[in-house]
């Protein structure tokens, strides 16, 4: 997993480059290591486009998210780092490895953050890189 940085204006793939540097100049650790076991209370960081760098803990793994209308996404990691609209796709990591990618958050009816953010594990991203990006269970 890596970040993509836009090198120059343009519509073609060659206008982007892979980088491990965050917009604040900080560098992500160890260029691509990932973990497969997600213990509770494991400290993680996320760097979202809206929220910037946030720190929190894994609260639960293998979480299903109900989007309504019978659409349920499975296998996410629930974390308590703060995230907001516009943070989707952010890297989630600890001090030595990538954990996943910011994929969703819980919000109150007034639009305020409800205390939980959801990351798609790196193991799912790499296993499904040639398949559809999201997988759904419909009832």
Where do the protein language model's features map onto the residues?
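C-terminal subregion of chymotrypsin/trypsin-like serine protease catalytic domains
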Residues: 94-139
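Long mid-to-C-terminal scaffolding/interaction modules that assemble large complexes
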Residues: 35-38, 76-80
């Amino acid at each position: 997993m890596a970040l993509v940085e836009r090198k120059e204006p343009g519509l073609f793939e060659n206008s982007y480059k892979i980088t491990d540097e965050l917009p604040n100049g900080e560098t992500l650790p160890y260029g691509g290591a990932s973990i497969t076991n997600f213990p509770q209370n494991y400290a993680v960081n996320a760097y979202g486009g809206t929220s910037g760098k946030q720190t929190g803990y894994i609260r639960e793994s293998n979480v299903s998210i109900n989007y309504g209308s019978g659409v349920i996404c499975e296998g996410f990691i629930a974390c308590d780092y703060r995230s907001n609209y516009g943070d989707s796709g952010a890297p989630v990591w600890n001090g030595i490895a990538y954990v996943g990618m910011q994929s969703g958050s819980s919000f109150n009816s007034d639009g305020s953050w409800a205390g939980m953010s959801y990351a798609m594990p790196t193991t799912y991203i790499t296993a499904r890189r040639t398949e559809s990006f999201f997988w759904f269970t419909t009832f």
